[in-house]
């Protein structure tokens, strides 16, 4: 999209896919399980819902090879669409499984009460945890986590612990998305417009998020359907889809923007999750030099090409991108797709202290199929 004037871009906007903060406030964007745990770079649920409605019917199968926090999977289930989501991140898959699973809420409340009543405990040995938490906060978290192995809902308790761990870090309130260094004394808080102090305990976060988790799971129960959801913890460049799919709805990582494993480092350290950050595509740590962009294009093209054999005859892929480097024409070609249509949406709100606006494209891809009668080379 480089070289386009802003006036030209505004003229192409699909207003059904573009919302202002007034049209779509945060509490609406983060309905039910979508706010089960903060996730930087989350797919807007209403965008996923609109793309699913436009391209798929109830009973069909959608695939998200970059499933992230599970937005496509949750929205697909609510529409009666079967969903398969893949992600290389252990934390992402944990969060997705909790969002889409059916829960015994009575048993969950019991297990949460037990975990909240557990005494503070010694945390796992970790220099990172010791650096980012006050000792009492870390012992609160470790005490709660000590109840996870005996729970009937261990993964749900793990998500509650992770969410509390995010809030209890020695980080400024206005800088929870990507804090760079621990805050060890009073600071001017841009979020609360006053002087704040570092967090010393985690128990109040655990209580608050335990209650909120049960409420959000119950809210999703009111709209969920019987449609199957499968979460695959794997590199989407290497998996074989087990069945035909009727479409893709996905938002791939943008190059050089977010380190998804590092974003949730607290969960990996506290819960002992397997860190596979070396397999991330477009990680911020890799930068945006030519070599990094080439590797990114290779990875996205391999992922889309891997899914192509499973496409049904009318299947399309809706791929949401901020393609300011004009990478996706070549990615689509190399993956064996043509771009049938481009929709443009205006994004004018961002989380935390980040401000500004930008444009995203929704690329509608179709597999390039051999023409009938064409001779093999």
Question: Could you say what each language-model-derived stretch is?
Answer:
Residues 48, 60-79, 83-90, 96, ...:
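Conserved proline-anchored active-site loop of SAM-dependent methyltransferases
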Residues 297-313, 332:
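A short glycine-rich, Lys/Arg-flanked "PGG" loop and its adjoining helix->strand segment in the class I
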Residues 253-299:
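Mobile active-site "lid"/loop adjacent to the S-adenosyl-L-methionine
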Residues 61, 314-318:
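Short glycine-centered segments of the SAM/dcSAM-binding site in methyltransferase folds
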Residues 1-58:
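S-adenosyl-L-methionine
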Residues 141-250, 255-258:
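SAM-dependent nucleic-acid methyltransferase catalytic core
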Residues 322-333, 337-377:
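Class I S-adenosyl-L-methionine
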Residues 90-153, 273-286:
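Conserved phosphoryl-transfer catalytic core
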């Amino acid at each position: 999209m480089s070289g386009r004037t802003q006036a030209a871009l505004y003229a192409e906007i699909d207003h059904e896919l573009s919302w202002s903060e007034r049209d779509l406030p945060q509490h609406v964007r983060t309905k039910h399980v979508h706010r089960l745990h903060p996730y930087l770079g989350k797919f807007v649920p209403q965008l996923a819902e609109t793309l699913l409605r436009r391209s798929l019917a109830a009973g069909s199968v959608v695939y998200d090879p970059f499933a992230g926090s599970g937005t496509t999977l949750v929205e697909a289930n609510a529409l009666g669409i079967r969903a398969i989501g893949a992600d290389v991140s252990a934390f992402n898959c944990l969060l997705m499984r909790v969002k889409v699973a059916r829960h015994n809420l009575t048993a969950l409340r019991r297990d949460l009460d037990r975990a909240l009543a557990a005494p503070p405990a010694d945390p796992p040995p970790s220099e990172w945890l010791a650096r980012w938490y006050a000792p009492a906060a870390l012992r609160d978290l470790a005490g709660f986590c000590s109840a996870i192995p005996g729970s009937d809902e261990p993964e749900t308790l793990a998500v509650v612990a992770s969410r509390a761990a995010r809030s209890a870090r020695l980080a400024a309130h206005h800088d929870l998305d990507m804090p760079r260094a621990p805050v060890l004394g009073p600071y001017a808080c841009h979020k609360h417009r006053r002087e704040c102090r570092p967090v010393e305990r985690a128990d109040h976060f655990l209580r608050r998020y335990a209650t909120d988790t049960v409420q959000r799971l119950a809210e999703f129960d009111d709209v969920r359907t019987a449609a199957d959801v499968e979460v695959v913890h794997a590199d989407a460049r290497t998996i074989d889809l087990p069945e035909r799919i009727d479409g893709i709805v996905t938002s791939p990582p943008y190059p050089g923007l977010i380190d998804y494993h590092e974003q949730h480092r607290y969960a990996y350290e506290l819960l002992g999750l397997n860190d596979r950050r070396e397999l991330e595509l477009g990680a911020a740590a890799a930068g945006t030099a030519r070599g990094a962009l080439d590797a990114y294009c290779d990875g996205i093209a391999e992922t889309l090409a891997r899914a192509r054999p499973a496409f049904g005859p009318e299947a399309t892929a809706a791929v949401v991108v901020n393609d300011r480097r004009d990478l996706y024409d070549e990615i689509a070609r190399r993956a064996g797709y043509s771009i049938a249509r481009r929709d443009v949406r205006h994004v004018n709100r961002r989380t935390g202290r980040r401000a500004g606006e930008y444009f995203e494209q929704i690329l509608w891809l179709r597999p390039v199929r051999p023409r009938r009668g064409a001779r093999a080379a």
